Amino acid sequence: MRIPPAIIAIGRNYADHAAEMGTKTDERPMVFMKNPASVCRHGDTIVIPRVCREGGPQVDYEGELAFEIARDCRDVPEAEAMSVIAGYRVANDVSARWWQKTGSGGQFCRGKSFDTFCPMTDLVPAGAVQDPQDLDIETILNGQTVQKANTRLMVFPIRFLVAELSRGMTLLAGTIVLTGTPAGVGAGRTPPLYLKDGDTVEVKIAKVGHLVNRVREE
């Protein structure tokens, strides 16, 4: 898979996910970055690195809809936002929770950026997805559904995200934007449900694709 120039991710973009993590949705989008080198493809193995042994079990799944920027753009009006989207992908924002919260001083980037921590499907052209704000999304772990929602439940819709992210900041062609995950992540459960060696995690999004990855511990 081609390495994108940037991966921008949105946190707390589904109210039910914010609630399960003990937080609230924000008045403005919560924005963080993932290392572009974290990308991998459908069918590749998610490898939990040895460094994730620090902090105990922690590697989590987050099924998400992603979109790709078609051309360099800046200060895009919300009314024109959809014109700069090349297409959509199914993504899994794999997250090492201890590194996300404690191991890196409270900054999300490192815990989200280990190699293979951003599996994605191939691009589906924007014209093939009539309404990206009405897509069923489902995450399945070892045959059991763990997340199920619809993209219409996003707090900040895609049009707004494009306009907001491009304010004063150039989005380069090929930039990937992950739009957030709904409730059901492993960290929000009692007891927590984290990925482990031998697991299979799937993310399905209607009209966009089906992402399947096995998990291996390094």
Segments the model singles out, each with a brief description of its role:
Residues A18-A19, H42, V76-E78, W98-Q100:
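Short helix/loop capping segments that flank catalytic or ligand/cofactor-binding pockets
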Residues M1-E64:
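Extended, compositionally biased flexible segments
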Residues D16, E68-R71:
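Active-site-proximal alpha-helical scaffold in enzymes
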Residues R74-Y88:
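N-terminal accessory regions of nucleic-acid-interacting proteins
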Residues H17, T23-T25, P49, R97-E218:
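Catalytic-pocket segment enriched in acidic/His residues
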Residues E64-E68, E138:
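Residues embedded in well-ordered beta-strands
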